[in-house]
């Protein structure tokens, strides 16, 4: 994952009196990730796919809030699971291409 870092080691000639150039006292690593998809908004609620759907935003204050996960169809369109579940109660097709909906992946 991470490459090995080059470390300066004192040579034999400077071993006694050499000082370190610097010393790392603290290091706070920061990382960011994102889904590798072309469309990054849920076409149903219009929220960013990485953000909470409107249903989860409304229930955010309650202690029983679930994870807001992403659902992928075989057509490779992604929606919040809550949004597509609510959509599928009335129509069994993808909201974007009108093909019959079938789950390909579900979750993070």
Curated annotation (Swiss-Prot):
UniProt keyword Cell inner membrane present: no
Q: Please provide, in alphabetical order, the Gene Ontology terms of the cellular component aspect for this entry.
A: Cul3-RING ubiquitin ligase complex; Cul4A-RING E3 ubiquitin ligase complex; Cul4B-RING E3 ubiquitin ligase complex; Cul7-RING ubiquitin ligase complex; cytoplasm; nucleus; SCF ubiquitin ligase complex
List the Pfam families hit by this protein, alphabetically. Answer: zf-rbx1
Q: Which GO terms describe its molecular function?
A: NEDD8 ligase activity; ubiquitin-protein transferase activity; zinc ion binding
Q: What are the alphabetically sorted keywords of the record?
A: Cytoplasm, Metal-binding, Nucleus, Stress response, Transferase, Ubl conjugation pathway, Zinc, Zinc-finger
Transmembrane segment boundaries: none
Q: What does this protein do?
A: E3 ubiquitin ligase component of multiple cullin-RING-based E3 ubiquitin-protein ligase (CRLs) complexes which mediate the ubiquitination and subsequent proteasomal degradation of target proteins, including proteins involved in cell cycle progression, signal transduction, transcription and transcription-coupled nucleotide excision repair. CRLs complexes and ARIH1 collaborate in tandem to mediate ubiquitination of target proteins, ARIH1 mediating addition of the first ubiquitin on CRLs targets.
Please give the family membership noted in the entry. Answer: Belongs to the RING-box family.
For this entry, the protein name equals E3 ubiquitin-protein ligase RBX1
Q: Which organism is it from?
A: Salmo salar
Protein encoded by which gene = rbx1
